[in-house]
UniProtKB/Swiss-Prot annotation:
GO terms for molecular function: proton transmembrane transporter activity. It is found in: Mitochondrion membrane. This is ATP synthase subunit g 2, mitochondrial. Pfam families: ATP-synt_G. Mitochondrial membrane ATP synthase (F(1)F(0) ATP synthase or Complex V) produces ATP from ADP in the presence of a proton gradient across the membrane which is generated by electron transport complexes of the respiratory chain. F-type ATPases consist of two structural domains, F(1) - containing the extramembraneous catalytic core, and F(0) - containing the membrane proton channel, linked together by a central stalk and a peripheral stalk. During catalysis, ATP synthesis in the catalytic domain of F(1) is coupled via a rotary mechanism of the central stalk subunits to proton translocation. Keywords: ATP synthesis, CF(0), Hydrogen ion transport, Ion transport, Membrane, Mitochondrion, Transport.
């Protein structure tokens, strides 16, 4: 056991340096996208969101969603799946459990 621990202690600085070197550009990109994408909407963006929601409701009422191409329908389905998945993940996180 002692040789294992000694070997691990000797290699730890090299492993940490490798991890920092590997993660530094990725964390910079991650931080950039979190500051850009996770900001709350500005007051100027709210009317566009309402207009988009009205357009979705209108297409559901008139049946114009049937004229979508397969690619557009697939992309819309993937976006809806992603939104609902993140909603449920956040609900589970907020409740601190799956049940209850």
């Amino acid at each position: 056991m002692a040789p294992f621990v000694r070997n691990l202690v000797e290699k730890t600085p090299a492993l940490v340096n490798a991890a920092v070197t590997y993660l530094k550009p990725r964390l910079a990109a991650f931080w950039y996208y979190t500051t850009v994408e996770l900001v709350p909407p500005t007051p100027a963006e709210i009317p566009r969101a309402i207009q988009s929601l009205k357009k979705i409701v209108s297409s559901a009422q008139t049946g114009s969603f049937k004229q979508l191409t397969v690619k557009e329908a697939l992309l819309n389905g993937l976006v809806a799946t992603e939104v609902s998945t993140w909603f449920y993940v956040r609900e589970i996180t907020g409740k601190r459990g799956i049940i209850g």
